[in-house]
Amino acid sequence: MSASSLLEQRPKGQGNKVQNGSVHQKDGLNDDDFEPYLSPQARPNNAYTAMSDSYLPSYYSPSIGFSYSLGEAAWSTGGDTAMPYLTSYGQLSNGEPHFLPDAMFGQPGALGSTPFLGQHGFNFFPSGIDFSAWGNNSSQGQSTQSSGYSSNYAYAPSSLGGAMIDGQSAFANETLNKAPGMNTIDQGMAALKLGSTEVASSVPKVVGSAVGSGSITSNIVASSSLPPATIAPPKPASWADIASKPAKQQPKLKTKNGIAGSSLPPPPIKHNMDIGTWDNKGPVAKAPSQALVQNIGQPTQGSPQPVGQQANNSPPVAQASVGQQTQPLPPPPPQPAQLSVQQQAAQPTRWVAPRNRGSGFGHNGVDGNGVGQSQAGSGSTPSEPHPVLEKLRSINNYNPKDFDWNLKHGRVFIIKSYSEDDIHRSIKYNIWCSTEHGNKRLDAAYRSMNGKGPVYLLFSVNGSGHFCGVAEMKSAVDYNTCAGVWSQDKWKGRFDVRWIFVKDVPNSQLRHIRLENNENKPVTNSRDTQEVPLEKAKQVLKIIASYKHTTSIFDDFSHYEKRQEEEESVKKERQGRGK
């Protein structure tokens, strides 16, 4: 039922009998009690939208009001001149900070809910003032002049950015600083307003502003602590004021330094990793490249030595890239320390090479150590070849082109090694040793063939991601002999082998071949001494024989020779201490 229809049904000239002191008058209300609320407008104000519009068309205008006259206080019988006033959501009128409760969402609607689309906060039923969450103030001992709806009305704001303040007057003929509904402010969100006399004295008064009201100053709310901090009166400078300014800026500076410190170290770390790895020669900076040329010109006895020399030149480059930053300097020094340890026992660094050297061995036979090495099958001669490797190549015809992979009789097994050190020594001494269970299986296979066909072993290092070669089993297992050359002393037994292929073949070349005797898993996902059926073994041997490799363990043969010498010296020292 619209307000315009109610105007035609109600007579004029009857006063309101309902007071604001008590709201428990459900049964005693008459239709004449609401005459002041719905009477025709004596002084219409065309600046506001008519109340008959259910959905306010000017919802997003800077300010929205209702066309009630000032002489007829709509919901108050105390003669107050409050008028309903609503503001648009988040509207700033005169550039003032919007720190006061907004009238659009700060007042309760029907049954205490939020008004819908800017509708006024009165209840839908005129007799339902007792449902107002803020209207029942009979127990507060306040004046009876204010009604349950007094907190829902506000005077037109002047310079508070569309916020609502009770008791404000926007017209010159109205009394300033008059807030009749202050008894309900303590109970609602509308009470959030400036309550400090010092703030009121420091802020200039504006017509219609209730900042300087004495009745409002008693209502201090904790949430209004921010505005006084920003508009506090000037005080003489003291050490506390001076210290407070750096205190606000200092965390930001520390945060920036922290961010800069955390973002700057990665480039030098990556730069040093490029220098220290076996694969990359370090073409990033000029200083490492010069050191690399010097290392190539020196006589090479082992691969770790150039790495250590090259790593010692890396910290100045890292420091130069960082500049005057002092925080990123500590990370680079441990790297030369680690590489110096690797110069003595380069086990950690060496095991990085098999996995990543595919990108570092495309430089005309020069590996990541900066030492000229011959790639297997490439035909190039090393600048400083190792004598042991040259002797092995002269005796054995590695990677033959006329290999007969189409076997009529024979057996093939997968061999998984713990490290490339053992692969190096197997090639060097032409022997191998498996686990106790593996030795029995290989020995039985060799004896079952009885010379009718070969027993091939497909070697792969755990975690390397490639097969490193193929060897043929040449003798039965001797269980009573310990070779004593392996990187670990737990292996017992020995049998002779002859290496045929020494090349790195990635698992991606062989992953499509699956073994029906191993749950149909790829041949690359096999355990030690896993037998490969003959038909599948032919496919594997064909791929390995025809694969054009770029890397092999021969590229790091000098490195493993040095490692073996170091291990043997350590064993001799232990034996000398034991005696």
Swiss-Prot record:
Q: How does it assemble?
A: Interacts with CNOT1; interaction is direct and promotes recruitment of the CCR4-NOT complex. Interacts with YTHDF3. Interacts with RIDA/HRSP12; interaction leads to recruitment of the ribonuclease P/MRP complex.
Which of this chain's residues are annotated to bind RNA? K416, S417, Y418, D422, W432, C433, N462, W486, W491
Q: What is known of its domains?
A: The disordered regions have the ability to interact with each other and to 'phase separate' into liquid droplets within the cytosol following binding to mRNAs containing multiple m6A-modified residues. This leads to the partition of m6A-containing mRNAs into membraneless compartments, where mRNAs may be stored, degraded or used to transport mRNAs to dendritic arbors in neurons.
Entry's localization field: Cytoplasm, Cytosol; Cytoplasm, P-body; Cytoplasm, Stress granule; Nucleus
Q: Which positions fall inside the YTH domain?
A: 410-544
Knockout phenotype, as recorded, reads: Female are infertile despite successful ovulation. Corpora lutea is present in ovaries, indicating that ovulation has occurred. Defects during oocyte maturation are probably caused by the deregulation of some transcripts, leading to an arrest prior to or at the two-cell stage, with various cytokinesis defects observed in the two-cell embryos. Males are hypofertile because of mild degenerative changes in the seminiferous tubules, including large scattered vacuoles in Sertoli cells and severe loss of sperm in the cauda epididymis.
What ranges does the record give for the region Interaction with m6A-containing mRNAs, renumbered to this chain?
A: 385-579
**CDD domains found in the cross-reference section:** YTH
Which residues are annotated with the PTM N-acetylserine?
A: S2
One GO MF term on file is:
C5-methylcytidine-containing RNA reader activity
**Post-translational modification as stated in the protein's UniProt record:** Ubiquitinated by the SCF(SKP2) complex, leading to its degradation.
The protein's name in its UniProt record: YTH domain-containing family protein 2
Instruction: Provide the primary localization.
Output: cytoplasm
Q: Which family is this protein grouped under?
A: Belongs to the YTHDF family. YTHDF2 subfamily.
Q: In which tissues is it expressed?
A: Widely expressed, with highest expression in testis.
Report the residues modified as Phosphoserine. S2, S4, S5, S22, S39, S196, S359, S394
Q: Where is this region: Localization to mRNA processing bodies (P-bodies)?
A: 2-384
